[in-house]
């Protein structure tokens, strides 16, 4: 049973307090499930003479920060990559994998959003979602509890949160039921999927019934990388999230486009959002074009026109080199704002975009306008 700091029981559907740090033995979840370790703002920092002087220097240098990087008085940004950690999910992760979930609370989310001028965050649960290696009723119940938690969060903070529903893939039947409930009853903005499930990438034919239903609904599918079965801990001392997450996004995109299921070609009405500026995809387009050229009958126009149909958010993909590669591959209309909170602060993405010296019009397009087009319920009246 999960309890808050006052010892009160915290059921899965209750939005209260913070995700407790569950003390167990085993691997820390940050090494295998989360995006990466949280940055320093979430750790305590002692007050010293040096820190006071550094703070004064920061104030004096504030004018050097580009105006676009300052959080506006009226929040405008829409964050499509913002994790929540429902207590019921945290408990399931500890029970199945061990370790301590990263610290998270609703107030932490709101504080970070306010600091960065984020009007609304579309939430998704943290890795690994609800998949712990078994197709069973527990995964279905956990998905339902997480989605109802997210819906309660929306009700408690109108306008600040929306959600991408988690579904119990690779359980096809359970996933179809949860899609119906989450989209029709809870009114989620779309579905969150992970790049791979027990070695099966999203283009695997086993998932065709799910994508067929999502295509019928013209649904939004937000995706997030996870630890691939093929490639964990290949380089000693380098976390999987550092090296493999971006590659795994590219693997699953390749499976959707070039795999035997031809999912991306068969179901063009699904709106895919890829994390982290598309992983390594923007750097490998010439190789995929060469592959498409060898399969002219299937890809008469090449691969890039298909990649340009997808959407990409910029969390942890907002350095000048990554943005340059992304903007070379797709137009501004396909790029969205994302933070990867609580593993990164939203201001990191704000600053990254500002450093690229985009026009005000392009910034508005990325930070809000594209989201308003995809999610019209978010647009201010």
What are the residue ranges of the model-derived segments?
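Hydrophobic faces of well-ordered beta-strands that scaffold small-molecule active sites
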Residues: 78-80, 121-123, 163-165, 191-193, ...
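Short, Lys/Arg-enriched N-terminal segments with co-localized hydrophobic residues
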Residues: 5-20
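Catalytic metal-binding/acid-base residues of hydrolase active sites
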Residues: 83, 226-227, 258, 278, ...
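Mid-to-C-terminal alpha-helical segments outside catalytic/metal-binding sites
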Residues: 17, 22-63, 71-76, 80, ...
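Aromatic-anchored helix/helix-loop segment that forms the rim or "lid"
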Residues: 103, 251, 295-324
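Acidic-and-aromatic substrate-binding clefts and catalytic sites of carbohydrate-active enzymes
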Residues: 102-103, 131, 169-175, 198-205, ...
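Aromatic-lined glycan-binding groove of carbohydrate-active enzymes
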Residues: 270-303
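Active-site gating/metal-coordination segments in enzymes
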Residues: 125-253
């Amino acid at each position: 049973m999960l309890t808050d700091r006052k010892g009160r029981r915290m059921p899965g559907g209750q939005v209260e307090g913070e995700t407790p740090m569950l003390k167990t033995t085993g691997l820390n979840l940050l090494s295998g499930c989360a995006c990466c370790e949280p940055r320093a703002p979430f750790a305590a920092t002692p007050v010293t003479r040096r820190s006071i002087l550094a703070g004064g220097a920061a104030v004096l240098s504030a004018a050097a920060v580009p105006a676009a990087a300052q959080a506006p008085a009226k929040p405008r940004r829409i964050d499509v990559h913002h994790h929540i950690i429902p207590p019921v999910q945290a408990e399931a992760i500890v029970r199945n994998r061990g370790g301590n979930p990263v610290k998270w609370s609703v107030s932490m989310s709101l504080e970070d959003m306010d600091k960065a001028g984020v009007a609304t965050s579309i939430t998704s649960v943290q890795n690994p979602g609800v998949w712990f290696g078994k197709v069973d009723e527990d995964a279905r119940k956990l998905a339902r509890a997480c989605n109802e938690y997210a819906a309660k969060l929306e009700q408690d903070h109108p306008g600040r949160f929306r959600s991408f529903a988690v579904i119990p893939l690779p359980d096809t039947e359970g996933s179809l039921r949860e899609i119906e409930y989450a989209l029709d009853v809870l009114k989620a903005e779309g579905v969150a999927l992970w790049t791979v499930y027990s070695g099966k990438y999203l283009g695997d034919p086993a998932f065709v019934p799910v994508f067929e239903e999502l295509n019928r609904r013209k649904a939004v599918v937000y995706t997030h990388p996870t630890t691939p079965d093929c490639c964990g801990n290949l380089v000693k001392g380098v976390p999987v999230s550092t090296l493999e997450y971006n590659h795994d996004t590219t693997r699953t995109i390749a499976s959707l486009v070039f795999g035997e299921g031809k999912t991306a070609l068969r179901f063009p009405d699904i709106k895919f959002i890829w994390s982290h500026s598309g992983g390594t995809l923007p750097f490998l387009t010439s190789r995929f074009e060469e592959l498409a050229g060898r399969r002219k009958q299937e890809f008469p126009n090449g691969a890039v026109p298909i990649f340009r149909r997808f959407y990409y958010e910029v969390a942890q993909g907002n350095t000048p080199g990554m943005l340059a590669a992304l903007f070379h591959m797709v137009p501004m209309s396909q790029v969205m704002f994302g933070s990867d909170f609580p593993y990164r602060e939203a201001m990191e993405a704000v600053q990254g975009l500002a450093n690229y010296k985009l026009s005000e019009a392009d910034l508005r397009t990325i930070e809000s306008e594209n989201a308003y087009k995809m999610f019209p319920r978010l647009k201010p009246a």
